[in-house]
Amino acid sequence: MNDTPNDIQKPKQGKRFSERLPHWLRQALPKGSVFDFTDKTIKRTGMATVCEEALCPNRTRCWSRKTATYLALGDACSRRCGFCNIDFTKKPLPPDPDEPRKIAESAKILQLKHIVLTMVARDDLEDGGASCLVRIIDTLHKELPESTVEMLASDFQGNVDALHTLLDSGLTIYNHNVETVERLTPVVRHKATYRRSLFMLEQAALYLPDLKIKSGIMVGLGEQESEVKQTLKDLADHGVRIVTIGQYLRPSRLHIPVKSYVTPETFDYYRRVGESLGLFVYAGPFVRSSFNADIVLQDMENKQSKMAKT
C-alpha cells in the first residue's frame, strides 16, 4: 500500500512535538446548562465514563450536547497501555450486577438515541466480560427499544466464543480499535497484538456480514505515512467499514510522549486514502473512536442511502 492514487495530493508535514500545542489543537471549552445536566445525571447514577477516566479532550463538547460514553465492567483495567489514563489494577473488583440498570437509567434520562459503551479490559474473567456486556445491552434494548447501541470492546484475548456472545446481543456497531500501526503496537499496547485485533475484526465480519464494524487509530506516535496507509488497507481487508483517526495527546508525562502534531490537511489526506479503499473515515485532530458517534452513524447511513439511489 505504498502507492497513492494520483488524485490524492499529499499534504505538508505536521509539526514535531513540543509542549506548546499548535493552533489547530486549541479549542474553547463550552459549558452551560446542558453540560451541567449531563454531569449531574452521570454522577447521580454512579456510572463511570471513558470521558472522565481517560481524560478525553472532548468531554465538555460531548456533554454539552448531552452525549457520553459509558465505561463498563468497572473503572480499573487489567492492562496498562502506554497511551491510556484509565487506572490499572492487578485485581479488578467483581463486575457490578447493578451496572445494566445504572447505564439504562442514565441513558433514559439523557434521552440517548445512540448509546455508546466501552469497557476496561477484563483479562481476569473467563469470557473477558462478554456475558456482563450482554446483560447491559439486553437491558438497554428493553428500556430504550428505539435506541441503537455501539460497543467498543477489548480483544477478549482472541476468544472468539466471547466475541460471538457479544455479537449475539443485537449491536448496531461493533468497534474494536487497533489503536496504532503494527510496528508501534508492542510499545503502545503491550498486552495486545496488531494481528490479533485484525483477527477479531475479521471474525466479527464473518459471523455477522451485515454488522457495521468500526476501528480506530491514533496518529502522532511516530508512525510513517506509509504505515497509516497500510493500516487502512489492513482494516478494509478484514471487514472494517468505519474508521476513526485522531491525534494522540498524552494524558500526563508518565505516558508515551507525542512525537508529532498531525495537521488537519494530513487528516483530510488520510480520510481520502481510506475512502479510496471503500472505508467511511472520520478523521481530525480531536476525533476519538466514540466522538460524535451518533453523527458518524447517521452520516454513513445517509451516504449509503445516496449511493443506493445512484
Curated annotation (Swiss-Prot):
Chief site of localization: cytoplasm
GO molecular function, one term: 4 iron, 4 sulfur cluster binding
Annotated EC: 2.8.1.8
Subcellular location: Cytoplasm
Entry keyword Ribonucleoprotein: no
Reactions that this protein is recorded to catalyse: [[Fe-S] cluster scaffold protein carrying a second [4Fe-4S](2+) cluster] + N(6)-octanoyl-L-lysyl-[protein] + 2 oxidized [2Fe-2S]-[ferredoxin] + 2 S-adenosyl-L-methionine + 4 H(+) = [[Fe-S] cluster scaffold protein] + N(6)-[(R)-dihydrolipoyl]-L-lysyl-[protein] + 4 Fe(3+) + 2 hydrogen sulfide + 2 5'-deoxyadenosine + 2 L-methionine + 2 reduced [2Fe-2S]-[ferredoxin]
Protein known as: Lipoyl synthase
A GO term from the CC aspect: cytoplasm
Cofactor binding annotation: Binds 2 [4Fe-4S] clusters per subunit. One cluster is coordinated with 3 cysteines and an exchangeable S-adenosyl-L-methionine.
Key words, A-Z: 4Fe-4S, Cytoplasm, Iron, Iron-sulfur, Metal-binding, S-adenosyl-L-methionine, Transferase
Main enzyme class: transferase
Keyword set includes Amino-acid biosynthesis: no
Entry binding sites for [4Fe-4S] cluster 1: C51, C56, C62, S290
Cofactor: [4Fe-4S] cluster
Organism: Chlamydia abortus (strain DSM 27085 / S26/3)
Gene3D superfamilies from the UniProt entry: Aldolase class I
InterPro entries xref list: Aldolase_TIM, Elp3/MiaA/NifB-like_rSAM, Lipoyl_synth, rSAM
